[in-house]
Amino acid sequence: MAQIKFVIKDKFDSNDPIFKSLVDTISNYNNVNKLKLIINITYNEGGEVAIMLAFVATIEKAVLNNSNLTIELRFGGFAMSAAAFVFCYFVFYADIPRVRVLSNTRLSVIYHKPRMKQKKSSNFIFANDPIKMKTLAKQQQTELISYTNQFDDVWGAVVAIYEMGGEAFDPSLLSSYNGNGDFAFTLSNRVFKGGY
């Protein structure tokens, strides 16, 4: 089986050529020979939600349309914001074949609602702040609400899986997330999903 490795550095950024290279690799893949894409996502602070969601959609579409393709997402160090979404999406939310998620080191996951930076300001705006939402253009408002709904759906899956284990989810953690705070947890290195 051939392998191709990619490294997503620091954050999901529209200026990072890795995303074009990944899309080109998948687009040119003919599904004849077995191929494994190894994507390293380490010490990632998040970045652009739109780029991250396009990355997630690319992985989903590629694996569902190519039976000889497997994808291994290797996390390490920390995964914040958009990177935390990718981790939680593939581990807790999506049931997609041939996607393996693992960490070779301890992993700190910091998950929070998506936000948009207000133009000409350093303020971040969350969708559940109606006053600040009005300062965004209509298109930005629509995007932020859509992003928030997707993040909330994945967060709901994280909570549901935890509670299926017989534990009650700490209400203060739910309040923190719903109040635009961070939810952080640290995991030991292991394979989280997909043993092939």
Locations of the language-model features?
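N-terminal organellar transit peptides
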Residues: 1-196
